[in-house]
Amino acid sequence: MRVAAFHAGLSAERRAAAYLIAKGYRILARRFRTPYGEIDIVARRRQLLAFVEVKARRSLDDAAYAVTRKQQQRIINAAQAWLMAHPEHETFEFRFDAMLIAPRRLPRHLLGAFDAST
C-alpha cells in the first residue's frame, strides 16, 4: 500500500506541475525537503513564487480538506528554508497554494489556500 500511495503521489505531482506549466508557471523545485517539512512544488510566475501542496483524493472535495494546520505549518517552515537557500528570490512575492487532484477531473488550483499567519 505504501508503494502504491507513493506512486500515486508522484503521479499527482506530475499532473499538478503540468497544469502549472500550462498556466505559465516555471517549476523551480519539486519535493523540496528540509528537516522542517517538504514542499511538493515551488513554482514561479513573473515576480511571484507559489509554494504548492498537492493533494490527491477520490474527489476534489476530499482533497480540499486534506491539508491540515500541522501540514500548513510544516510547509510554511520549509518555504522559509527554501527562501533562505535561494536569496535571489528574496524580493519576490509569495503565496501558499493547493493543487487538488482527483481521477477523471481537471486539477483545481486554489490560489492562496492558506497563509503564514494561520
Swiss-Prot record:
GO terms for molecular function: nucleic acid binding. It comes from the Bacteria. SUPFAM superfamilies: Restriction endonuclease-like. Belongs to the UPF0102 family. NCBIfam families: PRK12497.1-3, PRK12497.1-5, YraN family protein. This is UPF0102 protein Nwi_0116. The lineage of its organism: Bacteria, Pseudomonadati, Pseudomonadota, Alphaproteobacteria, Hyphomicrobiales. Transmembrane segments: none annotated. Signal peptide: none annotated. Pfam families: UPF0102 (PF02021).
